[in-house]
Amino acid sequence: MSESRSMVEIFSDGACSGNPGPGGFGTLLRCGERVRELSGFDPETTNNRMELLGAIAGLEALTRPCRVRLTTDSQYVCKGMTEWIHGWQKKGWKNSKKEDVANRDLWERLLVLVSKHEVSWHWVRGHAGHAENERCDELARQAIADGCSSVV
C-alpha cells in the first residue's frame, strides 16, 4: 500500500455494566494534531461486542483509505483479528470447540472495514496508565452513564 496514505491512530475501549447489560464504547482517532472522540451506547449487550464496536466506529469514521495503527486493551479483538479470524473463516465460522463464533456479525463488519485500510493491531494493558486508553475508557463509561446512542 502507498506511503502517501495518511497515518491515523485509533484507540478504542468497550465497557459493560453487567455482562450482558448496558454497555458503551469509546474511541479516539488522531491524525497529526487533529483528534476526534466517538462514543456509543447499547442498552443490552456484552463487553466483547462493545470492544468490537469501538474498533468498528473508529474505522467507519475514516473517509478515505489510510494506514491505521489500532490500539485496544482487548485481547479478544486484537487476537481475533491477528490470530483467530482466518481459522474461523476456513472452518465456516466455527471456533476451536466447533461452536459458532460469537459476534460473527461484528467480525464480518470489521473485516470489510479492515480491507479498505492498512491496519496494524496493538494491545495495551487496560487501566495501566496509557493516556489514550484511559480516555477511551472514560468515554465508554460516560456513554453508559448517559445512555446516549450517538453511534450504535
Swiss-Prot record:
Q: Could you say which cofactors this protein requires? A: Mg(2+)
Amino acids binding Mg(2+) 2: 13, 137
List the CDD domains: RNase_HI_prokaryote_like
The record's annotation in SUPFAM superfamilies points to:
Ribonuclease H-like (SSF53098)
Q: Does the keyword Cytoplasm apply?
A: yes
GO MF terms, alphabetically ordered: magnesium ion binding; nucleic acid binding; RNA-DNA hybrid ribonuclease activity
Q: Name one Pfam family in it.
A: RNase_H
Major localisation: cytoplasm
Question: What positions does the domain RNase H type-1 occupy?
Answer: 4-145
Location relative to the cell: Cytoplasm
Q: Which reaction does it catalyse?
A: Endonucleolytic cleavage to 5'-phosphomonoester
Which top-level group of life is the source organism from? Bacteria
Coiled coil ranges: none
What role is this protein assigned? Answer: Endonuclease that specifically degrades the RNA of RNA-DNA hybrids.
Give the family, as the similarity comment puts it: Belongs to the RNase H family.
Q: What is this protein called?
A: Ribonuclease H
Q: What organism is listed for this UniProt entry?
A: Syntrophotalea carbinolica (strain DSM 2380 / NBRC 103641 / GraBd1) (Pelobacter carbinolicus)
